[in-house]
């Protein structure tokens, strides 16, 4: 009988232990379910955060693309300005060649003037014996008049050529002004583009703190921005070089204008001298 009671007590104790274990298992189950729910909520929040990060990356990728397009436009404008400068250089070369040819004509005119003066001297000496050589001297004077007229015509033609060169220089000045305006516009666009690139750089840096998973993409974008910044500096350098070239061309044009003015004065003096010589021979 005592053994049965003892057995009953042991069974009762086992039952209580089993109930305690069941309650503990139920509590563990509930804790596991709560932990699972928490992890699911954290996963959903993380997915939303990553989705927002991806959207921002897409947005900044578009901004970077716009910056690249603007940089390409700035480089194209700088290239156009350099092409305009090269065209002006060619025009200056043509003007200088025309000036050289005009100087050659001037030398020819001076030579003919010297010949005409010598002929006039010979005519003056011939007038001393005009009674014996009247017909011969008249023919010689007529020939000298023809030579003087030809020399005057050459001088007038050279003067006309110089006026044409002056008109060309006026046209070149207009072209230079337009090239300078283009260079200034290119410099302004480069400055605007640099500000936009700075904004993109700041935005990309702030994106680094949002998700480590996208750090490699951000590094790539920063490298692209560095390349774009280098290209922008190169475009600015080209624009500055174009401005310096325009200034040099303007100086060359000023020098050519001064030389042109001096040559005109020289031609005017020669023309007046020819007129005086012609008048002197006519009066003789």
UniProtKB/Swiss-Prot annotation:
Residues 12-40 have a biased composition (Basic and acidic residues). One of its GO terms (cellular component) is cytoplasm. Belongs to the tropomyosin family. Keywords: Actin-binding, Coiled coil, Cytoplasm, Cytoskeleton, Muscle protein. Binds to actin filaments in muscle and non-muscle cells. Plays a central role, in association with the troponin complex, in the calcium dependent regulation of vertebrate striated muscle contraction. Smooth muscle contraction is regulated by interaction with caldesmon. In non-muscle cells is implicated in stabilizing cytoskeleton actin filaments. The molecule is in a coiled coil structure that is formed by 2 polypeptide chains. The sequence exhibits a prominent seven-residues periodicity. It comes from Rana temporaria. Residues 1-284 form a coiled coil. The lineage of its organism: Eukaryota, Metazoa, Chordata, Craniata, Vertebrata. GO terms for molecular function: actin filament binding; identical protein binding; protein heterodimerization activity; protein homodimerization activity. Its main location: cytoplasm. It is found in: Cytoplasm, Cytoskeleton. It comes from the Eukaryota. This is Tropomyosin alpha-1 chain. Residues 1-40 are annotated as: Disordered. Homodimer. Heterodimer of an alpha (TPM1, TPM3 or TPM4) and a beta (TPM2) chain. The keyword Cytoplasm applies.
């Amino acid at each position: 009988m005592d053994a049965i009671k003892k057995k009953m007590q042991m069974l009762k104790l086992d039952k209580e232990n089993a109930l305690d274990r069941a309650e503990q298992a139920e509590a563990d189950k509930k804790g596991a379910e709560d932990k699972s729910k928490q992890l699911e909520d954290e996963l959903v929040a993380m997915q939303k955060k990553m989705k927002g990060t991806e959207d921002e990356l897409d947005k900044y990728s578009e901004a970077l693309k716009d910056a690249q397009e603007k940089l390409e436009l700035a480089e194209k404008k700088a290239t156009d300005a350099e092409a305009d400068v090269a065209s002006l250089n060619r025009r200056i070369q043509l003007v200088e060649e025309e000036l050289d040819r005009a100087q050659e004509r001037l030398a020819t005119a001076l030579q003919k003037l010297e010949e005409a003066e010598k002929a006039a001297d010979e005519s003056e000496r011939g007038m001393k014996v005009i009674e014996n050589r009247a017909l011969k001297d008249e023919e010689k004077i007529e020939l000298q008049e023809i030579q003087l007229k030809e020399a005057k015509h050459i001088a007038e033609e050279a003067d006309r050529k110089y006026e044409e060169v002056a008109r060309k220089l006026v046209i070149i000045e207009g072209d230079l002004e337009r090239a300078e305006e283009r260079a200034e516009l290119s410099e302004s666009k480069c400055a605007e583009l640099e500000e936009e690139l700075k904004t993109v750089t700041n935005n990309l840096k702030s994106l680094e703190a949002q998700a480590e998973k996208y750090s490699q993409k951000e590094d790539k974008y920063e490298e692209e921005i560095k390349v774009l910044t280098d290209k922008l500096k190169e475009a600015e350098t080209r624009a500055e070089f174009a401005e310096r070239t325009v200034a040099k061309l303007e100086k060359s044009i000023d020098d050519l204008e001064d030389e042109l003015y001096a040559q005109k004065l020289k031609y005017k003096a020669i023309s007046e001298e020819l007129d005086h010589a012609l008048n002197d021979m006519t009066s003789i």
